Curated annotation (Swiss-Prot):
Protein name: dTTP/UTP pyrophosphatase
UniProt keyword annotations, A-Z: Cytoplasm, Hydrolase, Nucleotide metabolism
Annotated site (Important for substrate specificity): 20, 78, 162
InterPro entries attached to this UniProt entry: ITPase-like_fam, Maf-like
Protein's job: Nucleoside triphosphate pyrophosphatase that hydrolyzes dTTP and UTP. May have a dual role in cell division arrest and in preventing the incorporation of modified nucleotides into cellular nucleic acids.
Gene3D superfamilies: 3.90.950.10
Family: Belongs to the Maf family. YhdE subfamily.
Amino acid sequence: MPDCQNTNLPEIILASASPRRQQILREMGFTFSVCPSQAELHPDGSVAPAKFATLNAETKARDIARNTRQGLIIAADTVVVDTLGILGKPASPEEALNYLLRLGGKSHTVISGICLINTQNGQVRSGTCQSSLHMRPFTPAEAQRYVESGLPMDKAGAYGIQDREFEPVEKIEGCYLNVVGLPACTLVRLMKEMGFCPELHDNWQPEGDCTLCRIYRTGINQTC
C-alpha cells in the first residue's frame, strides 16, 4: 500500500443518486458533488456475485470518468444474494413483494462493490465488503404494507436495514454500512491505497472493527 501522506483529496464526485450513500459520505466528513451514472449491468448468473458488484461499480465509475478530468470518482453497487442468486432493486411492486417473501425468515448475504477512479492520473482501485444477515419472519400482509410505503423500491433486495417501521433484519454479522450501501472501512482502505489520508469527523474509526463505527452503534438516520 502506498504511503498515506496526502490529506488534500481531489474533488470527490459520487456516481450515485442514493441518499443513503450521500448521508454516509457527509457524516464521515467529506465534501462532494453528485453525478449519478446511468450505466448499469444486469445480473445474468454468468459471474459470481462479488465479481458482479465490483464490475457494476467499475462500470458506473468509468461512465462518469469519461467526462471528468479533475476529480476522484466514487461508485458503488450493492447486491443481495440468497441461495437462488442475486436480488437487485425491484422493477415493480410485485417483484418487491416476491423478494421480501423470498427473504423472510431466512439468511442471506449482502455484498457491496466500490470503485474509485482518480481522473487526474488514471489510478483505479476496487474492493468489496460482505455481510451476513438473517431476516425476521413476517407475514405477507406486513410485506405488502411495506411495499405500499414505497420504501423498498430503490433498494437491493427490496428492503432497508435502516427502515425502522418495518425492521426486517433480525441479526447481522459484519459491516452495517455495507448493508446500507457504502462500507466506510472499504472506502477508506481504497483511498489509502491511492495514497490519500482522508480526514474524518470525530468518532469515525473505520479500521475493520465494526464496533468502532459510529453508525454501527447508533443506526443511520431513518430519513436517509
